[in-house]
Amino acid sequence: MDNLTHSLVGALIGQAGLKKKTGLAMPALIIGANLPDVDAACFFWLEGTEHLGFRRGITHGPPALILLPLVLAGLLYGFDRWQARRGKRPEGRLPVSFKWLYALALLGCLTHPALDWLNVYGIRLLEPFSSQWFYGDTLFIIDIWLWLLMGFATWFSLRREKRGGDWRKPAHWALTLGALYIAGQGMITGAAERGVTESPTGTAVVIASPPPLMSWKRDIITGGNGLYTMNADTTFPGVPLDRCDLDAVRAADSQVDAFLFWARTPYVVPQEDGSLLLQDARFSDPRAAGRFS
């Protein structure tokens, strides 16, 4: 999911009451909820599509989910001590507990892979023990309805807190409604996939992909072996992948290797100049295809 969604989840957990457990609880929750995306630093040393084979992997696996919150808790604890030594520590800040900082950073961090799993992009939940991709196919990467729900609830909770009202309840309601919304989206995906009985390119692979905005609909991708159809009426150009020597190409080109490692529904698009372009049917929309090919 996008980082705004991750941040709002962390903020709502804090507004639900956990921010009173220790000083700097909100930074621990919000930064922790985004912490696995530290792998975005790979853009500094990887080229082209190589980042596709790196992201949502090692920093989203079990060891990182334990160690990254430990680093964050240590930094926040050290920051509090540094401010205290300089006489700059805010008077209204609660006493800082390292144990609670770590627990909250860990909780925030754990929400990250849970949310990332929900979309078609995928996540390698078990790195470095396994490089298997997992897909929830439940939400689009950016869900405007979750933004509106969680954004309003966060604002309303903070507003109530300033006025001395019950500020925890809006966060409780938002988290509950958000969970019910996600469960409903999962049911829509399941029903859409079960409704597929045939396709011009076969049904070896069936993906019900949530589109942006219209979360009640699904783009149905069907096919296999490099031949795919979208919504039963759009068949993508391609050739059977078992006729291609992909192993040789992967060995010769690290970008092709990374792309095919990440791709779930890869297909080959012949170009006018005679070259071949690899794409993924999940991101075949012209607005996104250039970033995933």
PLM ranges: what are they?
Residues M1-P210:
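N-terminal membrane-targeting hydrophobic helices
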Residues G202-V205, P210-S293:
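Extracytosolic and intramembrane catalytic regions of membrane-associated proteins
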